[in-house]
Amino acid sequence: MTKLLVLGGRFAGLTAAYTAKRLLGDKVDVTLINNTPYAAFRPGMPHVSIGVFKAEDLEVDLATALPAKGIKFVLGTVNAIDAKKNKVEYSAPDGKKENITYDYLVVAFGAKLGVEHLNGWDDYGSSVCEPDFATALHEKLEKFEGGNIAIGSGVFYQGTLKPRGKYPENWASVADSACEGPIFEMSLMIPAYLKKRGIMDKTHITIFSPGEEILTDIAKESRGVVKSLFAQAGFDTVWNFKLKELKKGEIVSEDGKTIKADIAIVLPPYEANDAVKNSTPDLFDDGGFVVTDEHMRSVKYPNVYSCGDSNQITVPKLGFLAVMTSRIAMQDLANRLGVPTKVDTYTPEVVCIADNPLEGFAIAVNDTTFYGGDEKIAQPSATNHIKKELFTKYFMWTNGDMALDKYLASW
């Protein structure tokens, strides 16, 4: 039986594992390695930070969910990929190093949150990118009685996309931030939360970005609407702010600019996974992301696929693109293993919903201008809030097996 090894249990890894088993059945032995025993629904972590959910409400138990679909689960942290010997080294929970071989590999362990680039992070940093971060931020917000809050993104250590994969030039560009959707979402949620607690009038909010302005991956017109919303809310905005240090009461940029911040809510810097430095070098580009073709196959090692944030092709780093790339990769694999399957065309699009659950509305974004297209929708409505709620329930109900996602992309 063909051995498929999947590295990572987030959107990309789960979609790859479930799709491969669905398409190939007994033709493939699927094993998934993840560094936590659960898969967190990360689009719900901002909701955890304001007390709408607890983190454990949004976690899928992989040791139960995966075997139920005929997929083996291994708890471990990937240390290295040897693409020449078809072998992966990982560390088990007891620290022991193990090796596992494969016929085909899916690299879906995502990017790394490079908090070590930010001096003072452990003492003063807050985020919503991981369950423990979101829980800690909620505890901090519950104690907050007014002052200054800064919300923004760290630098994306992406490299220069060289060598570039075999796909159209406009599918991937160098970006200042890996994804500023959570920043926009928090800019909606935090004021609503502070109003609910009766302390919004005691609080000043600043939005910052490492780019020339926020959300440069969507249309200029949509960014203009967002900036108008910020102005109406009385927020300060600071662009070209490349965060370097967090201190008590303020944050500092690489060029010495400061922003007052009793609480700093940050999308940390993104960079390549730690395993990259120990792995076969020519699997990756100069930023540590896997170089592939449009079917997500490595251009150097055709039995290696890369999906989601670990792939050079996915810019910005979005769950929507993670699911799409994984589905395409496993459709391609099915054909290679003798099961005729239609392979979807990769059509990159910025798709997300910035939710405001405390006020019952959300802004849905569908935008292709980053890739040279002309779609530029940014629509606020109560219906979009309901869509976000349904998407959350859908993910949890299916244990992350989003087979219908491509038909529900407007969510």
Give the role of each language-model region:
Residues 2-75, 164-217:
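Beta1-alpha1 glycine-rich phosphate/pyrophosphate-binding loop at the start
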Residues 28-31, 68-88, 100, 191-287, ...:
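A Rossmann-like FAD-binding core segment of flavoenzymes
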Residues 363-411:
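C-terminal auxiliary extensions adjacent to catalytic cores
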Residues 72-192, 196, 265:
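FAD-binding core/adjacent interface of flavoenzyme oxidoreductases
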Residues 288-305, 356-376:
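FAD-binding beta-loop-beta segment adjacent to the flavin cofactor pocket
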Residues 122-148, 155, 258-263, 267-324:
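FAD-site-proximal beta/loop scaffold in flavoenzymes
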Residues 9, 92, 109-110, 153, ...:
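Glycine-rich, N-terminal phosphate-binding loop of Rossmann-like dinucleotide-binding domains
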Residues 310-356:
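A conserved FAD-binding loop/helix module that cradles the flavin
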